[in-house]
């Protein structure tokens, strides 16, 4: 069955394995996860739990700032006897009977050796050319060449007479939702609500990440 939790990417470090191998790991802090709602097949058409992460400030009349919860969000969180949450996600394909509304989801949901998928928003790189953005090759840099880092041909002339949608061109790079699959949980620190994940995960430091059981290897 699927397991899931939300957290913040703290950064990277290194730990030693049992055999003395040096392992690069990403530190993810995953505290303050609370079940806000249970969804069942009878009522909602599918089974899922809705999890909230990080407290948001209570409703403030007249304020339009995102740091304050609105009244519907405050009322929704009140049913779970908790504060309004900044981030809310659903996790499906799990046994909803194991969860109760208001229950805290802690890092011990996962164990050392679990294979997981990690989803985050990739680092924004701003406007970049085709070489950095798509890995295209460059032209000769000498011998009279006038073609260095330009994209090259982007379409045909008379027949089609247009640039097709999806053509790889310069543009804004990064800031996309990215999932890295089949990463391994190296260590779970319940005292500090921290999970150590082997390798790197998407996003900058302090970026939101979603950890779920691997969709490909989780049930093996």
Swiss-Prot record:
GO BP annotations listed: translation
Coiled-coil ranges per UniProt: none
Similarity comment text for this entry: Belongs to the universal ribosomal protein uL3 family.
Name of the protein this chain belongs to: Large ribosomal subunit protein uL3
InterPro entries given in the database record: Ribosomal_uL3, Ribosomal_uL3_bac/org-type, Ribosomal_uL3_CS, Transl_B-barrel_sf
UniProt-listed NCBIfam families: L3_bact
Domain of life: Bacteria
Keywords: Ribonucleoprotein, Ribosomal protein, RNA-binding, rRNA-binding
Functional summary from the UniProt entry: One of the primary rRNA binding proteins, it binds directly near the 3'-end of the 23S rRNA, where it nucleates assembly of the 50S subunit.
Cellular component terms per the entry's GO annotation: cytosolic large ribosomal subunit
GO function terms (MF aspect): rRNA binding; structural constituent of ribosome
Residue ranges of the region described as Disordered: 61-81
Keyword Ribosomal protein annotated: yes
């Amino acid at each position: 069955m699927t397991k899931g939790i939300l957290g913040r990417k703290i950064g990277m470090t290194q730990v030693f394995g049992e055999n003395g191998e040096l392992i690069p790991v990403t530190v993810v802090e995953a505290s303050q996860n609370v079940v806000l709602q249970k969804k069942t097949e009878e009522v909602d058409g599918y089974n899922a739990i809705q999890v909230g992460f990080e407290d948001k400030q209570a409703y403030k009349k007249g304020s339009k700032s995102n740091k304050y919860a609105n009244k519907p969000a405050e009322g929704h969180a009140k049913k779970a006897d908790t504060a309004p949450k900044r981030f809310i996600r659903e996790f499906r394909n799990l046994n909803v009977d194991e969860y109760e509304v208001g229950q805290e989801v802690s890092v011990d949901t996962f164990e050392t050796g679990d294979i997981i998928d990690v989803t985050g928003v990739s680092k924004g790189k701003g406007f970049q050319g085709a070489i950095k953005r798509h890995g295209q090759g460059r032209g000769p840099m000498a011998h009279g060449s006038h073609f260095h880092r330009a994209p090259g041909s982007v379409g045909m002339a008379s027949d089609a007479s247009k640039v097709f949608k999806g053509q790889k061109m310069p543009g804004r790079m990064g800031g996309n939702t990215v999932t890295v699959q089949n990463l391994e949980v190296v260590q779970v620190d319940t005292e500090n609500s921290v999970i150590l994940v082997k390798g790197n995960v998407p996003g900058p430091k302090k970026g939101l990440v979603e950890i779920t059981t691997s969709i490909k290897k989780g049930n093996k």
